Amino acid sequence: MASALSPGSRVLIALIRVYQRLISPLLGPHCRFTPTCSSYGIEALRRFGVIKGSWLTVKRVLKCHPLHPGGDDPVPPGPFDTREH
């Protein structure tokens, strides 16, 4: 995980946080995945940066629908991530 986030990543993370605090409580819990799509997006942006993190987040949100079973779907390890998954 990079120690310094790009300005683009910071903006997107801030937008996700606004969604988490203002919109998500009104909609109620309905994400099919663990972690939630918004948490996944924040982690993907932190781990991969704005371009790849955004792409992973969009792919994840597009999978979050009633025809997909959902389940555990963690963010893939980053290029410098030494943790075992």
Curated annotation (Swiss-Prot):
GO terms for biological process: killing of cells of another organism. Keywords: Cell membrane, Cytolysis, Hemolysis, Membrane, Toxin, Virulence. One of its GO terms (cellular component) is plasma membrane. Pfam families: YidD. It is found in: Cell membrane. Belongs to the UPF0161 family. Could be involved in insertion of integral membrane proteins into the membrane. SMART domains: Haemolytic. One of its GO terms (molecular function) is toxin activity. This is Putative membrane protein insertion efficiency factor. HAMAP family: UPF0161_YidD.
